[in-house]
Amino acid sequence: MTKNWKVSSQDVFSQGPVVPVLVIKDVKHAVPLAKALIAGGIRVLEVTLRTEAALDVIKAIATEVPDAIIGAGTVTNAKQLAEVEAAGAMFAISPGMTSDLLDAGNKGGIALIPGISSISELMRGIDFGYTHFKFFPAEASGGVKAIKAIGGPFPDIAFCPTGGISPTNYLEYLSLPNVRCAGGSWLAPDDAVEAGDWDRITELAKQAVAGAAGI
């Protein structure tokens, strides 16, 4: 199926290598946080729908930070997919998948990256025409060994593992041929965001990018 996505899931994955998973409670933090991450070399940003401010945060970044590739996380149904697209998201990431969500993603205007944690779920997503997936929760679902094993029968499928990813293990994931990027929350610690310590966040981003460049 040909999808009418403005930005493909392949484009999103290739702009990695690290995707910060952002839980932003106050919209006033949205723009400076996005700019701090971009200053550190990270353009792909995932704003999770875990706070009441999430849609406003996405809208603010989409409007005021044109260099950002802004997406929404924790998208679990077709209604939310439509809402984040209307807010300006360029892609949506789900922790799982349903038939309704996969169908809505195929018909929508932004890239949908479904979540899987098993081969059966992966095969279901492939049946709907998807090739790029979130592997979640990564560490709890077998981690590096699990993704490596999945790559055997499905060598053309790409993953972005999220869940338990940290500065101490993200390079292990990125070294796998079927992993294009990794998602993590360590790039924007709550205390740094609340304090407006944007220099610290920029430095964390620079460190993550530099580490990945060595692979």
From Swiss-Prot:
Its EC number is 4.1.2.14. Keywords: Carbohydrate metabolism, Lyase, Schiff base. It catalyses: 2-dehydro-3-deoxy-6-phospho-D-gluconate = D-glyceraldehyde 3-phosphate + pyruvate. Involved in the degradation of glucose via the Entner-Doudoroff pathway. Catalyzes the reversible, stereospecific retro-aldol cleavage of 2-keto-3-deoxy-6-phosphogluconate (KDPG) to pyruvate and D-glyceraldehyde-3-phosphate. Involved in the degradation of 3,6-anhydro-L-galactose (L-AnG), which is the major monomeric sugar of red macroalgae. The cleavage of KDPG to glyceraldehyde 3-phosphate and pyruvate is the sixth step of this pathway. It comes from the Bacteria. This is 2-dehydro-3-deoxy-phosphogluconate aldolase. InterPro entries: Aldlse_KDPG_KHG, Aldolase_TIM, KDPG/KHG_AS_1, KDPG/KHG_AS_2. Pfam families: Aldolase. Belongs to the KHG/KDPG aldolase family. NCBIfam families: eda, PRK05718.1. GO terms for molecular function: 2-dehydro-3-deoxy-phosphogluconate aldolase activity. Pyruvate binds at R50, T74, K134. It is an enzyme of class 4 (lyase). The active site is at E46 (proton acceptor), K134 (schiff-base intermediate with substrate). Pathway: Carbohydrate acid metabolism; 2-dehydro-3-deoxy-D-gluconate degradation; D-glyceraldehyde 3-phosphate and pyruvate from 2-dehydro-3-deoxy-D-gluconate: step 2/2. The record marks T162 as: Plays a major role in determining the stereoselectivity. Disulfide bonds: none annotated. Homotrimer.
